[in-house]
Each structure stands twice: as structure tokens, then as C-alpha cells.
Amino acid sequence: MKKSNRNSIDTPETFFVWSNELQDRFDPFFYRPVFKKLLAVIANNKTGTIHLKEAIINSVAGEWGEDPIDFEPNPDYELCYVVRNTNFHNDFNLDFSDVAQRYIKKSKAEKLALKKGDILIEKSGGSPIQPVGRIALVDDLPFDKPVVFSNFLQKMEVNKELFLPEYIFVYLQALYKIGYMDFIQNQTTGIKNLRLDDFFKILIIKPSMAEQKKVALKAIKSREEAKGLLEKAKTILASIDTFVLGELGIDLSGENRAG
């Protein structure tokens, strides 16, 4: 459906698809002209491209594990931190302020253990107003136990002879922000799922390593600066409230603070 420019009424978007264009899916969203145009722009890039599946050396699905509250530990399992969808920040990267702990089978924990440079993909989740497919880059892991990831996520290891993980991260993050993942998802029982076969067919523009580093560092630095400004703005806004109440004789410090 497409929004009319004149009002908020949904009006049908009509277009045609040649039979030889059809692949293994009949979802009309996948064949929308705007998506075809986006694919063409990427494919015709002068720098050259390769498919995402050719840019990685490994991809593995996650594991949710067992709840420590009602699981009886045994030597085959170990307590791990488990990164999940809620640890993804929509505008930045991973947020480790609330990381779950679960028992994971040791044989699986070894395969799933995250390390610096790994990329996580949100393959299931989303919301009515948010597509699935958010991207995260594993950097520092400030934990005293192994860190794995849930079954709603997928881990990729980048072929570092071809690409910098930081570049793949900012590239896929940019595609997510412009709505690319909208076209390669489907929905069942309220949960959106990323079509991984289509995801790994994403064309990755392949500049030189020097250019990859330049692009990645600039993007990451800019997002860090934006995050800092956001935190500063929150502090300023809170100080305004404190000032106003203070001028009115309402002291929120010490015993007079509510809650």
C-alpha cells in the first residue's frame, strides 16, 4: 500500500512484473519499483560489488539456552551472557546495560562465543513500525563470562582479507536506515523475519581497504559524536527542570526527592 500525498488514506500501488523476473517468492513488496531502482544503483556502482555471502567466512544462528531460575546446572552447561534484540540500539550499536544470563551447552557456547569484529544481525523481531534486520558490531566485551547471542540473532564473521568488519557494519547499517530490510522480510504470527537467503545476496560495494577504513571511521566517529550530543542534551533538559522547580522552592535533593 502507498500513502496518498493529499491525505492519509491508503491507496493501492499498482505495478507489473515480468514472469522471467519472478524468483522463489510472490511477495509484491519484493518487486516494487523503488526496490528495483535501489538494487540497480548499487549494482551499477563504479567501484565494483560482491554478494555479502562472499564477504564472510562463517555464519551461525544463536541459542537462547536455559533459565537459571529453574534449570539444574550440570557439567555439560555453563552460565553465559546472552545478547538479545533488546541490546540493539536503533541509532548506535550494542547497549550492554541489561544483558541476560542463561545456561548454554558448552559445545554450543564454544561455537557461539562472540569476539571483537563479529557482526550480529537481528533475523527475527521488529515491530509494527520498525523493520527487522538491525545490525551490530562486536567491539569490547566487558564481561567475566562467555558472551553468546540469542536464537533471534545471527552471527557473521567477515573475511578480513576482503573487508574491514567496521566497513561491513556501517554499510549494512546504512542500508537498514534507508529501508532496504523492509523489502527482504516477511511476517508470521506477529514476528517479522529476515529472509536470510535474500540478506546474503545483498551487494556489497568493495572499495580499497584504505577507503573502507576512511568510510568506517568517519561513520563510527560521527555516530559516537551524535550519541555524546544526545546524552548532553538529556543532561541539559534535566537541569532545566531542576532549575525551574528550584526557583519555585521545590528541592529535589536529599530527603525531599520523590521515590
Label every PLM stretch briefly.
Residues 1, 52-59, 88-95, 142-204:
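Basic, amphipathic alpha-helical recognition segments used for DNA target recognition
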Residues 1-67, 201, 208-259:
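Non-catalytic DNA-recognition/assembly elements of restriction-modification systems
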Residues 41-91, 107-109, 126-127:
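Low-complexity, Lys/Gly-biased intrinsically disordered segments
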Residues 65-73, 98, 183-185, 255-256:
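Short coil/turn segments at secondary-structure boundaries
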Residues 108-113, 127, 142-145:
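Short, surface-exposed secondary-structure edge patches
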Residues 116-117:
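Loop/turn positions that initiate beta-strands
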Residues 127-137:
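Short, Lys/Arg- and Gly-enriched loop/turn segments at beta-strand edges
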